[in-house]
């Protein structure tokens, strides 16, 4: 199930003790004994993007605890609304971002304020307005210009709170942008302290209480086993709640929970977890193997302990080794994609690695169209392959 409840009216759903959700789970329990909550973080908070934005950088967590001017300054950063909450644009930025088209940007999309400082023209001061201007234009140069203007608009240090214009949120990932580079070294240090506090400490107790309003009611409404997709930017309060409610975590070796580890240690996974090689939103093991040679090199030599030449493509024996390691993990459940199972057999697996991936979240135009490349009848005839899987599962005690 998804956590789409979090973009509905929370107060209305809370008034009847989440009856709509509880009914939904009771109906599911007639057919299933376990379910996964996709993006369980949505029960703690959701990332809300304003209607005037195309990209997500100008979003803010809902619910959240925005910061006042006084609190921002308590971190040692002098708050300057004009500089910090509006796109910072100067000649250097325009020349760097747009090159030979910088003059066109000056004449059409921005207006001069003072010295070498500019601001977006009112007719182009949101990403949606820029999007409308470029509607129907497919030339690559125009598309690059549009993306550049999007970036220009999101070049702010703080996002104004959606409900209170006197409160602010540090813009996510702003350390990569021009406005951050305008700060002095001391100001950057102050901003980083504020940023880390906001994104990794400030909301833990607050979001814990938010989740505990909803999740106990829902997870205890049936006897179904509950798994949670707890990947990505996970605040500390998430494992607190999942452990308290005995919700299984999702463990993926290439997305370790410990930030000090390059890869997760399969043998150290918690019992209350689901281990898998990859999800529908990720490349298969064979696809991942060919994405970044330096990463697979580290995995091959350091994590697996092999020596000799690094295989250019993931051979069947290597795929089998990775599958076996997952089967022998302490995780309560080991659930692998069909593509990662068939990767063990070089004569059976799909020769086209690219079409094995189910979903590409970063591509809004991608749609789910994956299909097995052989029929079930053909698969049932693969006696040696099927026997191997049967033995691997039995030997691992699963």
Describe the residue ranges of each PLM region:
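Catalytic cores of glycan-processing enzymes that make or break glycosidic bonds
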Residues: 3-4, 8-398
């Amino acid at each position: 199930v998804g956590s789409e409840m979090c973009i509905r009216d929370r107060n209305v759903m809370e008034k009847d003790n989440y009856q709509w959700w509880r009914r939904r789970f009771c109906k599911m329990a007639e057919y299933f004994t376990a379910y996964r909550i996709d993006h369980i973080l949505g029960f703690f908070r959701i990332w809300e993007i304003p209607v005037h934005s195309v990209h997500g950088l100008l979003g803010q967590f809902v619910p959240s605890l925005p910061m006042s001017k006084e609190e921002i300054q308590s971190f040692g950063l002098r708050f300057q609304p004009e500089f910090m909450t509006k796109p910072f644009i100067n000649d250097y930025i325009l020349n760097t971002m747009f090159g030979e088209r910088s003059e066109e940007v000056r004449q059409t999309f921005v207006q001069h304020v003072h010295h070498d400082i500019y601001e977006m023209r009112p007719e182009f001061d949101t990403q949606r307005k820029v999007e409308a201007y470029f509607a129907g234009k497919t030339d690559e140069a125009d598309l690059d210009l549009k993306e550049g203007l999007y970036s220009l608009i999101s070049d702010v240090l703080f996002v104004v709170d959606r409900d209170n214009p006197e409160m602010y949120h540090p813009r996510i990932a702003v350390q990569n942008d021009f406005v951050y580079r305008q700060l002095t070294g001391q100001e950057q240090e102050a901003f980083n302290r504020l940023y880390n506090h906001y994104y990794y400490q400030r909301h833990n107790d607050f979001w814990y209480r938010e989740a505990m309003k909803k999740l106990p009611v829902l997870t205890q409404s049936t006897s179904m086993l509950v798994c949670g997709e707890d990947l990505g930017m996970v605040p500390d309060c998430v494992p607190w709640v999942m452990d308290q409610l005995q919700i299984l975590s999702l463990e993926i070796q290439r997305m370790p929970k410990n930030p000090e580890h390059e890869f997760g240690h399969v043998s150290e996974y918690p019992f209350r977890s689901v281990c898998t090689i990859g999800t529908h939103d990720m490349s298969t093991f064979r696809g991942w193997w060919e994405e970044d040679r330096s990463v697979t090199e580290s995995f091959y030599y350091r994590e697996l302990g092999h020596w000799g030449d690094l295989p250019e493509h993931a051979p069947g024996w290597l795929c089998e080794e990775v599958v076996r390691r997952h089967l022998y993990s302490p995780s309560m459940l080991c659930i692998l994609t069909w593509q990662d199972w068939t990767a063990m057999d070089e004569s059976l697996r799909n020769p086209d690695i690219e079409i094995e991936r189910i979903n590409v979240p970063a591509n809004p135009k991608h749609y789910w169209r994956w299909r097995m490349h052989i029929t079930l009848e053909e698969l049932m005839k693969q006696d040696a392959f099927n026997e191997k899987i049967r033995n691997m599962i039995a030997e691992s005690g699963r």
